[in-house]
C-alpha cells in the first residue's frame, strides 16, 4: 500500500469512527451519517451521480424509512470493528480504490480483471448434501496456504480486494482463512458455509479481525432443509447464527431454491426467522441438476422463476417491512450488466 493510499484510508477510517462515536445517540447519529455521506461524495468525486447522494440524504432524514431502520439496527447490533473493517475494505478499498485500479488495468492490459474472486481452499466437506455441484470435484483437493496468499497478493496488484470462499466446506480450513484475513487486512473476505463448524473460538477471532462475513446455507424450515442436508443440520445452523449474532458478526444466508421450496424460502414467516437470528442479507441461487444424486425434477418452473423475480423485488421495496437485503444470483443480473463470468467481474478458482 503506497503512502497516498495509506493517507486516504486513514481519512476514511476517521470518517467511519465519526459515525461509530455517535452510535448510541439518535439525532447525533443521523448527523454523523449525513456527514459521512458528504465525505464520501467529496472523496469519490464524479464516480457516482450527484442525485445518488441527494437521495441518500433525503432517506437518512426519514426515521420511518425501512432502510434507515436497517442501517440503524446494524449499527446497534454489529461489532464496531466489523462495521469499520467492512466499510474500509469493501467500501473504500474494493469499491473505490479497487474499482479505479481495475478500470485502469483493464485498459492497460486489454483484458478482463475481476472485481471479486471466488476460491475453493478445499474440496473436502463434512456434509453430503443431495445435488451438491461441488461434489463433482471430489473431496481430496486443496490449495496450499502459500498459493491462496499469493493469488490474493497478485489480485491486489490488479485492484481486486474482495475474496469469497466456497468448497467443499471452506471452514474445514478455518485456521488458514483467519490467517489470510490477518495477513491481508486490507481485503474483505466472505465465506459460503454450511455453518456447522462455527464455534465460539472462531467467532471471537473473526470479531477481532472484522474483515470476514458469511453466507450460511439454508433450504427452508427443518423438514425440508434436513431432508437435503442431513438430520439436525437446521438446528446447528440456527445455533451458529445465534453465536455469530452474539459476537456482532456480519452474516446472511445462501439459499438454493427449488420447485419444492421456492414459496417457503421467500415467505414472510421464513424471512422473519432469518431476521430474528441476525441475518442481514440473503443470497438466492436456483437449483441446477448437477452433482451428487442430481434431481432434474427439482428445477424451478418458468412460472416459479417469474414469481421469485417479482417477489424478491417486492421484499426489497418499501412495500415490504422486511429488514433484510435479498439478492438473486441469476435474476438480478441486470444490476451488474449481465453475465459476470469470464473474469469480467468475477473469477472462480477451484481446489484442483
Q: How would you name each of these model-derived features?
A:
Residues 1-54, 58, 226-342, 351:
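Radical SAM enzyme [4Fe-4S]-AdoMet core and its adjacent flexible, acidic
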Residues 34-201:
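Conserved alpha-helical substructure of the radical SAM core
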Residues 135-139, 221-223, 289-292:
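A short, flexible beta-alpha/helix-coil linker loop
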Amino acid at each position: 500500500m503506497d503512502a497516498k493510499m495509506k493517507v486516504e484510508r486513514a481519512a476514511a477510517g476517521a470518517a467511519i469512527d465519526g459515525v461509530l462515536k455517535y452510535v448510541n445517540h439518535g439525532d447525533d447519529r443521523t448527523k454523523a451519517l449525513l456527514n459521512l455521506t458528504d465525505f464520501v461524495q467529496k472523496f469519490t468525486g464524479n464516480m457516482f451521480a450527484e442525485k445518488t447522494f441527494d437521495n441518500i440524504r433525503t432517506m437518512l432524514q426519514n426515521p420511518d424509512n425501512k432502510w434507515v431502520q436497517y442501517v440503524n439496527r446494524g449499527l446497534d447490533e454489529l461489532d464496531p470493528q466489523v462495521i469499520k473493517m467492512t466499510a474500509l475494505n469493501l467500501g473504500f478499498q474494493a469499491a473505490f480504490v479497487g474499482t479505479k485500479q481495475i478500470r485502469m488495468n483493464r485498459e492497460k492490459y486489454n483484458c478482463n480483471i475481476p472485481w471479486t474472486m471466488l476460491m475453493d481452499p478445499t474440496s473436502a466437506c463434512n456434509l453430503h448434501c443431495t445435488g451438491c455441484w461441488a461434489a463433482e470435484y471430489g473431496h481430496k483437493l486443496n490449495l496450499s496456504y502459500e498459493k491462496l496468499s499469493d493469488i490474493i497478493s497478485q489480485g491486489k496488484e490488479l485492484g481486486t480486494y474482495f475474496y469469497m470462499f466456497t468448497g467443499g466446506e471452506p471452514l474445514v480450513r478455518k485456521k488458514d482463512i483467519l490467517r489470510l484475513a490477518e495477513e491481508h487486512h486490507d481485503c474483505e473476505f466472505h465465506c459460503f458455509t454450511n455453518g456447522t463448524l462455527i464455534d465460539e473460538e472462531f467467532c471471537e477471532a473473526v470479531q477481532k479481525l472484522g474483515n470476514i462475513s458469511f453466507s450460511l446455507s439454508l433450504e427452508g424450515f427443518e423438514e425440508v432443509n434436513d431432508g437435503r442436508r442431513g438430520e439436525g443440520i437446521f438446528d446447528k445452523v440456527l445455533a451458529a447464527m445465534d453465536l455469530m449474532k452474539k459476537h456482532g458478526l456480519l452474516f446472511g444466508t445462501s439459499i438454493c431454491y427449488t420447485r419444492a421450496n421456492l414459496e417457503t424460502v421467500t415467505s414472510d414467516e421464513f424471512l422473519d426467522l432469518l431476521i430474528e437470528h441476525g441475518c442481514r442479507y440473503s443470497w438466492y441461487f436456483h437449483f441446477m441438476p448437477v452433482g451428487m444424486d442430481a434431481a432434474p425434477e427439482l428445477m424451478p418452473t418458468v412460472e416459479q422463476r417469474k414469481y421469485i423475480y417479482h417477489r424478491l423485488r417486492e421484499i426489497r421495496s418499501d412495500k415490504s417491512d422486511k429488514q433484510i437485503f435479498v439478492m438473486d444470483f441469476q435474476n438480478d443480473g441486470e444490476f451488474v450488466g449481465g453475465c459476470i463470468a469470464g473474469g469480467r467481474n468475477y473469477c472462480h478458482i477451484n481446489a484442483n
